[in-house]
C-alpha cells in the first residue's frame, strides 16, 4: 500500500516537471519571449534619456510661486530659461537652465508654445529681473503680460503694435543713425560715431531691399545692390542735414521721389546735381556712386527699385509710429528692467521685416553696452523670437548665435519646422544656427511633417536585443542578436501628448520634459494691457529744396558749378499722390 502511494507521488512529480519544462520551452521559443531591452556594451549606440540625478545636476530646481513673486517675496536669484517642471500636488518646481545658452524650440501649430512655454518664461523673466524682447503674432503676450510687467514688477514696457500703429509706441527706424550722426557733428573727430551711423544706414537699406525682393536676385543683383547704396546715401543725407522732426524713413522715400525731376541741366537729374554739391570724399556720394554713374535707363531702374522697396512705409497709420521719437533705448534696456513686445499682424507679413531690423539694431547696441561693462552684461537679456522662421532673414543671425552668448544675451528662436530656417538662411546657415543653439526643445510634431524624423535622428540609437525562433519537428531553436534602435522613433515622437517635449542640451543626455498649462503653474492674468490711441500728429517731411540749401551752406558751391536758375523752384501744383514737402 505504501509502495503504491509512493509510486503515485513520483508519477505526479514527474508530470509536474514535464509540464513546467514544456511551458518554459514554449515561452523560450516564442517570439514574445524576445524582449527589446537594452543589452551589450553600446556596440550599436549608447543613447538614453537622462536620469533624475543627471537632471538635477544639469538644471536648477526653482520653486515656481508667481503669487509670492508678485508681492515681492521669494524672488528667484537664478537667471535663465525655464525648460521643464516637476509637480507634486499643487507645488510646482521649475527646471531652469542658467548657463549662457541659446535655444531653439521646434513645435508645430497648436503645440502650446505660448500657453505652455512662453507664459512661464515671461513670468520667470519678470521675477528674476531679466530684460526681454518678444515677437508676438497673436498679441496675447502684450495683452496679458505688458500690464503685469509694468504695474507689478516695475518694468519699463514698450509695445510696438504693427497691427494697430496708432496705438503703438514710437519706433523711428533712423533713430540710431540720427543719434550717432549728431554725436559726430558735435565732435567731428569722433570717427567711431560716424562709422556707426553709416553702419546702421547700411543695415536699414539692406533689410528694406531684401524684405521686398528676397535674397536671390540673379542677373538683377546690380539694380538691387545699387538701390541699397542709394537708400543708404539718402538716409545719411537726411540724418546730417535735415531738421530733427523730418529725420525719418518716409522722408527718404519723398526725397528720392523729388530728386527724380529734371535739373534744368541736360542729361542730369536733381539727384545727380545734389550729390555733386558734396565733397568728393563724402560717403553719401560714394554709396550712391553705382546709381548716379549708370546710364539713363539703368539709373531709372535703380531709382524705381529703391522707391518700390520703400513702398511698405507709405501708410498713414504706420507714419504715426515711424515718424516720431523712439521709446526703446538699448542702453536703458540693458541697465534697467525693460520689456519690449512687438505685435505682428498675421494678416500682413509685409511688416515683419521691421522685427528683423529691430533685432539687428538692438543686438549691435547691446554689444556696445556689454563692451562698456567689461565684455558681458551684468543683467541677462532674453530675446524670444516667436515665428522666427516666418520673419524675413535677419542679417548676421548666424553671427548672433555664435557671439552673443558670451555677452549674456540669450536668443530663443521658435520655429514650426527646420525647413523654415533652411528656406531663409540656406542649408549652411541653418546648420550654423542649430549648431550654436545649446538647447533644443522639440514637441508637437505634425503627422505629415518630417521634423519628427530629424529629431529622432538627433536623439541617436541605443543597443537592444533582437532575435529569431525556428521550429523543427523535434529541435526548435532560438538565436539572439544585438541591433541599433532609435531612442525614439518618429511614430513615438508624433504620438507624444500635448505639453511633453524633448529637451536636448549640449554635453548632456536628452530629457523628457513635461511643461504644464500656465494655469497649473499658478499664473493668472490681470486686466488686459491696452494702449491708448494717440491723437493724430502732423507728420513733417524733408524737402529737397531745404536739403540743397543746407549742403551749400555747409560746403559751398563746388568750383566751376553754378546753381541753374529755377533749380530751387518747384511746381506750385504737385502731381497727384505726391507728398507735400515741408520747407
Show the residue positions of the predicted features:
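Basic- and hydrophobic-enriched, low-structure N-terminal and domain-boundary segments
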Residues: 1-111, 115-123, 128, 166, ...
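Conserved ATP-driven motor cores of ASCE-family P-loop NTPases powering translocation/secretion/packaging/pilus
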Residues: 401-502
